[in-house]
C-alpha cells in the first residue's frame, strides 16, 4: 500500500502499486489528460511505470521545464519511427535533447536532402495524429541485446555493451518501432504536436572522425503553437544576423581551409578590432593595470610545472627546435607569473595588476569551430591580479564595476552573474576557500546585484564569478570572469615579502572582460546586425556628390574629415543620388552626407542617418560637433 505525498502535502494511500497516471486520475480527469511523466522522490519517472513504495510525487505536465524536455526527447524517437518507415535499411545511433530542441544521428548509405526532411516531417505528422500509446518496457541487458540484434541496430548494441549487466534498460515502443533510452517519454503521442525539423548536418559516431560518418537531423519542439512560432521567428532573425554572413557581406573577415579556426581580418574588421583594443587599453590604464607582452612559444617544462601539460596537452599546438619541445601558449597565466617573479616583491607592491592582449592557440576539434565564436587562435583581454587574501574582496568589487562599465558602453544592460563555489576535488585549505567565497559573495551583495549560486562548479584551484550577456535575441553569451587561484602561484614559485618580512605566496585573480576579441566582435556583429554605432563603424560617414559640379567640394570635405581623424569616404560616381543613398545604406554607414549645388554654395552637407531620417543641413564645424557627440555616446542607447 504505497503512500503518495504530493507537493502541497496531500497524502494519498493506494491499495497496490500505482502509476503517476493513476495518481493524476485520482485528482481529476483534466490533470490525467495533461500528465506527461512523474518526478518520484526527485527522479523523473515514466507516467505508466508502477510506484511500489511510499514516495513523494510531482506530476509533470507540458507547463513544466522537464515536460518540454520530455516532449523533445519523445520527438527524437518519432524521427526514428518515421525514418525507419521510409528508409527501412538505415541504422539509428543516438537522439538526445539539446537546447531548444533535439537531434538524431543516423547511419545511411543514402544521403538525405532537404526534400527528404520535408518527407520525414510529413510522416511524423501522420504518426502523431494517430494518438497511439507509447509503451515502456523495462528489460534486462540480454533481452535488449536480443531485441536490437533482431533489428540489426549495430549502434544500439554498442551502447548496450557499455551498460552494467545488473542494470535494467528502458525500451520504448512506438507501434512497430522500438528504441532505447533512460527516459522518461510521453505516454501517448497526443502530447506531441508542435514541432519543426530544422536542418541536416554531418557527424561522427561518438564525435570521433575515425569512426563511421553519420547524418544528423535537427528539430525543435514546444508545448504550444505560439512558442514554436516565436522560436522559428528567432531562428530566422538569428540567421539574418549571422556574423559569418555579415562578415562576408561587409568585408570584415574570412576563414579559409588552409588555416581552420584562424581569422583573416579585412581592413573593415581590423578597424573594429583596433578600436576595441584601444578602448580596453584606456580602461586598463585608468584602473592602474600594467600592460605586458609575453612569448608565443614556451618550453614544455613550464607547462609541466604549471600542470597544463598533463591536463591540456592534447589541446596544445607544439613545435620542436634544437631538441626542445615548445608549446604555443593556450593561455597567458604561467607567463604572467614569470613576469611577476622577476625581482623581489613586497606586500607594498600588491595588488599588482598585469594585463596582456595575449594571442593564444588551442587545438579545438574541427567540428566545433564556428566563425568568430569558436576559433583556434584568439586574443584575450587577459589580466592577472597578484594580491593578498585580504585584498580579494576589494579587487573583485572594483572588477565588477569595470565589467558593468564596459558592457553598458556596448549597450548591454542585462548581465547574468553566477558564483561558482568549491568542488569536491580541490587544492588549498578550507580556511582560504571560506575567505575567498566570502569575499566574492560580499563583493556581489554589497552592490545589490542579482546573482545565481552554482555549488561545486568552481575550479579545483578557487571559486569564480562568471558574467554573461543577454543579446537582442535573448541568447546568453558568457564573456567575463574573475577567478581566484591559490594553486598556480605556489606551483610556479611566486612569492612576496609580507609585513613580518616572511615570504608568502600571493593569491592570483584571473580576469577577463570580453573573453576574447574574436568572440566579442562576433557577438557585436550579431547584436548590431553590422549597423555599428558611429564610434565602432569602419566608415563613419560617406559623402555623396549629386552632379559632377559637386565632385571637387565632395573631395575637399572628405579630406577635411579624414584630417580631423574621422573615417570618411566619398562616392563621386556618375550615378543617381537615390542609388548612391541606397548603396550607402546597405553598406551600414551611420551617416550619409549629400553634397549638391545648394550645399556647395552654403559650404555644408545635407545629413541623413542610417535609418533614413533627415538630420538637416550642417556646416562642417557643426558636423564635427555632431560627430563628436555621437562618438562620445559610444554604444549607449538613450
Swiss-Prot record:
The cofactors it requires, by name, are: Zn(2+)
> Is the keyword Cytoplasm assigned to this protein?
yes
Q: Which GO terms describe its cellular component?
A: cytosol
Q: Mind telling me which Pfam families this protein's record contains?
A: HGTP_anticodon, TGS, tRNA-synt_2b, tRNA_SAD
Family, similarity comment: Belongs to the class-II aminoacyl-tRNA synthetase family.
What role does this protein play?
A: Catalyzes the attachment of threonine to tRNA(Thr) in a two-step reaction: L-threonine is first activated by ATP to form Thr-AMP and then transferred to the acceptor end of tRNA(Thr). Also edits incorrectly charged L-seryl-tRNA(Thr).
Designated name of the protein = Threonine--tRNA ligase
The coding gene here is thrS
Amino acid at each position: 500500500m504505497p503512500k503518495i505525498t504530493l507537493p502541497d502535502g496531500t497524502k494519498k494511500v493506494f491499495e497496490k502499486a500505482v502509476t503517476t497516471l493513476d495518481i493524476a486520475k485520482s485528482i481529476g480527469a483534466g490533470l490525467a489528460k495533461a500528465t506527461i511523466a512523474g518526478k518520484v522522490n526527485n527522479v523523473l519517472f515514466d507516467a505508466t511505470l508502477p510506484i511500489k513504495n511510499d514516495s513523494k510525487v510531482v506530476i509533470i505536465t507540458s507547463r513544466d521545464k522537464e515536460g518540454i524536455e520530455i516532449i523533445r526527447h519523445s520527438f527524437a524517437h518519432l524521427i526514428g519511427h518515421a525514418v525507419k518507415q521510409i528508409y527501412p535499411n538505415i541504422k539509428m545511433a543516438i537522439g538526445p535533447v539539446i537546447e531548444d530542441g533535439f537531434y538524431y544521428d543516423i547511419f545511411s548509405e543514402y544521403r538525405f536532402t532537404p526534400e527528404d526532411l520535408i518527407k520525414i516531417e510529413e510522416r511524423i505528422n501522420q504518426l502523431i495524429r494517430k494518438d497511439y500509446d507509447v509503451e515502456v518496457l523495462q528489460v534486462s541487458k540480454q533481452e535488449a541485446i536480443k531485441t536490437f540484434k533482431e533489428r540489426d541496430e549495430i549502434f544500439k548494441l554498442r551502447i548496450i555493451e557499455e551498460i552494467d549487466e545488473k542494470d535494467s534498460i528502458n525500451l520504448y515502443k512506438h507501434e512497430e518501432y522500438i528504441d532505447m533510452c533512460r527516459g522518461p517519454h510521453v505516454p501517448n503521442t497526443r502530447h506531441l504536436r508542435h514541432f519543426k525539423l530544422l536542418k541536416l548536418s554531418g557527424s561522427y559516431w561518438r564525435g570521433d572522425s575515425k569512426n563511421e560518418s553519420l547524418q544528423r537531423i535537427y528539430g525543435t519542439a514546444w508545448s504550444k503553437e505560439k512558442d514554436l512560432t516565436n522560436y522559428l521567428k528567432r531562428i530566422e532573425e538569428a540567421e539574418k544576423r549571422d556574423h559569418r554572413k555579415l562578415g562576408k557581406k561587409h568585408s570584415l573577415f574570412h576563414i579559409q581551409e588552409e588555416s581552420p579556426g584562424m581569422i583573416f581580418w579585412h581592413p573593415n574588421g581590423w578597424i573594429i578590432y583596433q578600436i576595441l583594443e584601444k578602448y580596453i587599453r584606456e580602461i586598463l590604464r585608468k584602473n592602474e593595470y600594467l600592460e605586458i607582452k609575453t612569448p608565443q612559444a614556451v618550453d614544455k617544462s613550464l607547462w609541466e610545472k604549471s600542470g597544463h601539460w598533463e591536463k591540456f596537452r592534447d589541446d596544445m599546438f607544439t613545435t620542436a627546435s634544437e631538441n626542445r619541445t615548445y608549446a604555443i601558449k593556450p593561455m597567458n597565466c604561467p607567463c604572467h607569473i614569470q613576469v611577476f617573479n622577476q625581482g623581489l616583491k613586497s606586500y607594498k607592491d600588491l595588488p599588482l595588476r598585469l594585463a596582456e592582449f595575449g594571442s593564444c592557440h588551442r587545438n579545438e576539434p574541427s567540428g566545433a569551430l564556428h566563425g568568430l565564436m569558436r576559433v583556434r587562435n584568439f586574443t584575450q583581454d587577459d589580466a592577472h591580479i597578484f594580491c593578498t587574501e585580504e585584498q580579494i574582496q576589494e579587487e573583485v568589487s572594483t572588477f565588477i564595476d569595470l565589467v558593468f562599465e564596459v558592457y553598458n558602453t556596448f549597450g548591454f544592460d542585462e548581465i547574468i552573474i553566477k558564483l561558482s563555489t568549491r568542488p569536491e576535488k580541490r587544492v588549498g585549505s578550507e580556511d582560504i576557500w571560506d575567505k575567498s567565497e566570502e569575499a566574492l559573495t560580499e563583493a556581489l551583495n554589497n552592490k545589490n546585484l542579482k546573482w545565481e549560486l552554482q555549488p561545486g562548479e568552481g575550479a579545483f584551484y578557487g571559486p569564480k564569478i562568471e558574467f554573461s550577456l543577454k543579446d537582442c535575441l535573448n541568447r546568453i553569451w558568457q564573456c567575463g570572469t574573475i577567478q581566484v587561484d591559490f594553486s598556480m602561484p605556489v606551483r610556479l614559485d611566486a612569492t612576496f615579502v609580507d609585513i613580518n618580512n616572511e615570504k608568502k605566496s600571493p593569491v592570483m585573480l584571473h580576469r577577463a572582460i570580453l573573453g576574447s576579441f574574436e568572440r566579442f566582435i562576433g557577438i557585436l556583429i550579431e547584436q548590431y546586425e553590422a549597423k555599428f554605432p558611429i564610434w565602432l563603424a569602419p566608415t563613419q560617414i560617406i559623402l555623396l556628390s549629386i552632379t559632377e559640379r559637386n565632385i571637387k567640394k565632395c573631395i575637399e570635405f572628405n579630406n577635411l574629415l579624414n584630417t580631423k581623424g574621422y573615417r570618411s569616404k566619398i562616392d563621386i560616381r556618375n550615378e543617381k543620388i537615390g542609388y548612391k543613398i541606397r548603396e550607402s545604406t546597405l553598406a551600414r554607414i551611420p551617416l550619409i552626407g549629400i553634397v549638391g549645388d545648394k550645399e556647395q554654395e552654403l559650404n555644408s552637407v545635407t545629413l541623413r542617418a542610417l535609418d533614413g531620417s533627415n538630420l538637416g543641413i550642417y556646416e562642417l564645424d557643426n558636423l564635427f560637433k555632431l560627430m563628436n557627440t555621437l562618438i562620445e555616446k559610444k554604444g549607449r542607447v538613450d
